[in-house]
Amino acid sequence: MAAMTVQLDIVSAESSIFSGLVAHLQVTGSEGDLGVMPGHAPLLTHIKPGMARIVKQDGKEEVFYLSGGILEVQPSSVSVLADVVMRADDIDEQAAAEAKRRAETAMADAGADFNYAAAAVELAQAVAQLRVVETIKKNIAR
């Protein structure tokens, strides 16, 4: 018996990153982790910077970094719209670690005119990228 699937499209501001049938999608929603499977109730929600993990129709898993965005679930399709989407293999671990360090330093040395919100977003994105890299490393080590 074939696995139940749903059409998933992951789109960035620049291009379509993934389009295909999936058995499962997991993202970080505004209220925590969110799993979507075929037959999920319709939904429209914000997603936070983090990982999108998909299980494709053939059972293979793929991981992406999302900078945040919108998740729309319809009866026959799921759409993820994000400003930035990166395949896990394309993340520059050193650049993400440096961005994290810069944001932490800026927040620690903040003055009166410091844009805390922008630094917090940069920090959240860098930490999310590093989590995606760590997840991939753990999966490879298995």
UniProtKB/Swiss-Prot annotation:
Secreted in keyword set: no
Gene Ontology cellular component list: plasma membrane; proton-transporting ATP synthase complex
Cellular location(s): Cell inner membrane
GO molecular function: ATP binding; proton-transporting ATP synthase activity, rotational mechanism
This protein's record includes keyword Membrane: yes
Coiled-coil intervals: none
Annotated CDD domains: F1-ATPase_delta
Membrane topology: Peripheral membrane protein
Protein family per UniProt: Belongs to the ATPase epsilon chain family.
Alphabetized HAMAP family for the sequence: ATP_synth_epsil_bac
Keyword terms: ATP synthesis, Cell inner membrane, Cell membrane, CF(1), Hydrogen ion transport, Ion transport, Membrane, Transport
Name of the featured protein: ATP synthase epsilon chain
Pfam families xrefs: ATP-synt_DE (PF00401), ATP-synt_DE_N (PF02823)
Function: Produces ATP from ADP in the presence of a proton gradient across the membrane.
Subunit structure: F-type ATPases have 2 components, CF(1) - the catalytic core - and CF(0) - the membrane proton channel. CF(1) has five subunits: alpha(3), beta(3), gamma(1), delta(1), epsilon(1). CF(0) has three main subunits: a, b and c.
Organism of origin: Shewanella piezotolerans (strain WP3 / JCM 13877)
